[in-house]
Amino acid sequence: MVKVTDIVLWDKPGEKVLLLGNQAIVRGALEGNIGVYAAYPGTPSSEITDTMAMVAKKAGVYMEYSTNEKVAFETALSASWAGLRAMTAMKHVGLNVAMDSFMTVSYMGINGGLIVVVADDPSMWSSQNEQDTRAIAKFANIPVLEPSSVQEAKDMVKYAFEISEKYGQMVILRTTTRSSHMRGDVVLGELPQEIKEGKRKFGNFKKNPEKYVDIPAFQRPKHPWLLETIEKFREEFNTSPFNWIEGPEDAKVGIIAPGLSYAYVKEALAWLGIDNVKILKLGTPFPVPYGLLEKFFNGLERVLIVEELEPVVEEQVKVWAFDNNINIEIHGKDLVPRVYEMTTRRAVEAVAKFLGVETPINFQEIDEKYKKVQEMVPPRPPSLCPACPHRNTFFAIRKAATPRAIFPSDIGCYTLGVLPPLKTVDTTIAMGGSIGVAHGLSIALNGALGEEQRKTGKEKKIIVATIGDSTFFHTGLPALANAIYNRSNVLIVVMDNMVTAMTGDQPNPGTGETPHGPGKRILIEEVARAMGADFVAVVDPYDIKETYETIKKALEVEGVSVVVSRRACALYRIGQLRREGKQWPIYQVNEEKCTGCKICINAYGCPAIYWDAEKKKARVDPLMCWGCGGCAQVCPFGAFEKVREGEL
């Protein structure tokens, strides 16, 4: 059986293979002779990093899981300054974390080709917003490439390295959830000899303070350079292999479609049976090439711009048309929604309205049927996995702090604690935000410990923040230092499942593992003690009583308390046991002891436990039970009993 990693490394130019969009990006990086790759995982970009981790050593590429996107960007940047081709990848909100360095470096330029892959998430399938990276790139004057197919996802990477070096500027490769996760045919290109041999590349850094030091005197002359450079990219994109005009030359109407919208437009026109439309396919949404625009607009009377999210291309086209006195009817966001991802239906409706034709399908009728079916479907909210240690931690927190407490939380699997029956998440905003919000609430509601006028005793509001291990290292550290320094009065529970679970079980500083060998493990409790936390403890959440008692004790402490709740992610651990051919414990309900009180369902909420309406007893699905024993600990009647021994 051929593995994906083998395909990504295949030395078979011209061979057609099936790859995920994110895997194709890795192949493109290898064909482009990448030297250094650094990233923090974030859906929908995670498979880029995971695939690179699996092939890097064999290809002679240095690859790391960085602690956050800013660090990853700076790692890749410095490799570029040393003359190596480098790449970083992140989800769209990850660019916010890297923005400080990103914006400054736009003035400074690069040496070796530098690619910043940013995976946007229209419709917010796994994100807190759907910000459009193209708009940020326009703000920063950084060029953007956007693939319309898996083949382009690969080919654009090599091209991006080349133009990045040609003009001395980093390039953004903007993908979306769909282009990241779609599969398609890819014709492989040639691998460089160094990649074939797995020869590690080392750079050479030449000191140049005027370029690399960002004091105002050095930076001031660079702003004109930045503006001149983006215009050079605009000229370059007039002949880019990823931009072209298709359709009849005598067409009176035209459609501009950047990135994946091109594929949707082609499908929409096929549905509508229309072929007398000229199309400008754009693989470079910023900057839009004016020379190509001029050719495209020749002879047209009306133009529609079909793009996801923000009117980035539309605004550029309209400004160009106005500046050149081109009096043509231009439509965009008046027909194409500004929110959520592009779909074939959306493209069909927009194009049909633009052309004044009927859609081939009665979408309203489908909507009405969908509503009726939706009413019949039982609610299926997401849930923490069976045996998830976070469930036990949340249960203990809620019991110790009581529901009257305030529970700021963070970004990770544990965000699901917002749902019943746990309901132990009151706020989330961004990575590391739990500790900052907890501190702010503590100051606003109770006051700092150093203040004379502060609330104490029963007047004091209990605030318990929850944050994951990877998130703690990502952006939790500055917030913890701030809370300790400013004498906050909060409990911070670090839910350490010993892996970056939500994005695909990647390592982090708390695991001590790296793709290129053993790393240095950093223990969260040691960091908390070194920072000066007033109370620090480590618990095993599979022991709910111990966890509850420790949290109760921590809540009595004046100051910042840190409790590390450490137990391996159940999904990750079960995978290990399966690969080792080992079994895990299983629990079942003793019907004679079960009183039907439903505490296991209404307060604990493990998905392996269900209600037998006929017998009015709780049941355990043996195929879902992973044997953590939490149910046996929360049941007041001892109705849950272990029926199979095993490891966990």
Curated annotation (Swiss-Prot):
Its EC number is 1.2.7.8. PANTHER family: 2-HYDROXYACYL-COA LYASE, INDOLEPYRUVATE OXIDOREDUCTASE SUBUNIT IORA. It catalyses: indole-3-pyruvate + 2 oxidized [2Fe-2S]-[ferredoxin] + CoA = (indol-3-yl)acetyl-CoA + 2 reduced [2Fe-2S]-[ferredoxin] + CO2 + H(+). Its cofactor is [4Fe-4S] cluster. It comes from Pyrococcus horikoshii (strain ATCC 700860 / DSM 12428 / JCM 9974 / NBRC 100139 / OT-3). This is Indolepyruvate oxidoreductase subunit IorA. [4Fe-4S] cluster 1 binds at residues 594, 597, 600, 635. Heterodimer of the IorA and IorB subunits. CDD domains: TPP_IOR_alpha, TPP_PYR_PFOR_IOR-alpha_like. One of its GO terms (molecular function) is thiamine pyrophosphate binding. Keywords: 4Fe-4S, Electron transport, Iron, Iron-sulfur, Metal-binding, Oxidoreductase, Repeat, Transport. Pfam families: Fer4_7 (PF12838), POR_N (PF01855), TPP_enzyme_C (PF02775). It comes from the Archaea. [4Fe-4S] cluster 2 binds at residues 606, 625, 628, 631. Coiled coil: none annotated.
